[in-house]
Amino acid sequence: MLVVDDEPLIRWSLVEMLTASGHTVTEAPDAASARRVVRDDSQRPDVVLLDYRLPDSNDLGLLAMIRREAPDTQVILMTAHGTPELARGALDLGAYRVVSKPFEVHDLTALVSEAYASTH
């Protein structure tokens, strides 16, 4: 599992929560780091929890790259600025789900587990 978020506190909280739920988690603070992880076959995650707005990628380009290069990886897009158009665009590109920040811990861990189960 890969968590991609540029906000250190949010990223740390997500990593802690998902680790406590039994997931092995890698983290990336930006799109460039996420690309390296996804492209490395030894690290390729089954699920990516991806923040929509990153300093080096504020569109759906990273989502498209992940779906193209790792088609079996499920991507959950997180956003604090969601619109129906963004959700539709993300789902059209193959996002597993789009979730709005803030979210309930239980809901997110259940969604991650569901996404992970769909890869096996």
Residue ranges and their predicted role:
Residues 60-72:
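Short amphipathic alpha-helix used as the core "switch/output" element in two-component signaling
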Residues 61, 82-97:
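Alpha4 helix (beta4-alpha4-beta5 surface) of REC/receiver domains from two-component response regulators
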Residues 85, 103-113:
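C-terminal output helix
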Residues 27-47:
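Acidic, metal-coordinating helix/loop segments flanking the phosphotransfer/catalytic sites
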Residues 8-27, 93:
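Two-component/phosphorelay signaling modules centered on CheY-like receiver
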Residues 30, 58-61:
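Acidic catalytic/metal-coordinating carboxylates
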